[in-house]
């Protein structure tokens, strides 16, 4: 799967808006993920106790993790598909230590698309959504290949 230069520009344009409030975006994305796919919360020992949206919003740890997730994703997106160096350690930790299934990466991708659309409707129309979906699918496909190399079926 290849994105055109124009598609990458759409992705990176909206990503600049994410980076302007990376903590807020990360928090919103994780809350949406955990609310719509509560099974994903079980992978996070330090968040399992957070049962309500209010508790999630009050959690500094959750906000910090959102920053970590989006910082890593931003570094990958900025490589425009040439993300081997960034992907390798991420795949290693997610396959061997955290055991995060690819399905969960699909779930967080859905949350990312939803949050970006709700926060930036003028900058995240159908073309930008399509480009971001392709970029996230490329990321998932490549991380799934790394998982396979590591012997994790995820």
UniProtKB/Swiss-Prot annotation:
| Parts forming coiled coils | none
| Post-translational modification Phosphothreonine, affected residues | 68
EC number, UniProt record: 1.7.-.-, 1.11.1.-
Q: Principal localization?
A: cytoplasm
The regions listed as transmembrane in this protein's record are none
Positions contributing to O2 binding: 65
Which GO biological process entries does UniProt record here?
A: removal of superoxide radicals
Q: Where in the cell is it found?
A: Cytoplasm, Sarcoplasm
Gene Ontology MF: a single term? heme binding
**Keywords for this protein:** Cytoplasm, Heme, Iron, Metal-binding, Muscle protein, Oxidoreductase, Oxygen transport, Phosphoprotein, Transport
- Family the UniProt entry places it in: Belongs to the globin family.
Q: Quote the function comment for this protein.
A: Monomeric heme protein which primary function is to store oxygen and facilitate its diffusion within muscle tissues. Reversibly binds oxygen through a pentacoordinated heme iron and enables its timely and efficient release as needed during periods of heightened demand. Depending on the oxidative conditions of tissues and cells, and in addition to its ability to bind oxygen, it also has a nitrite reductase activity whereby it regulates the production of bioactive nitric oxide.
Protein name, UniProt field: Myoglobin
Q: Which organism is it from?
A: Kogia sima
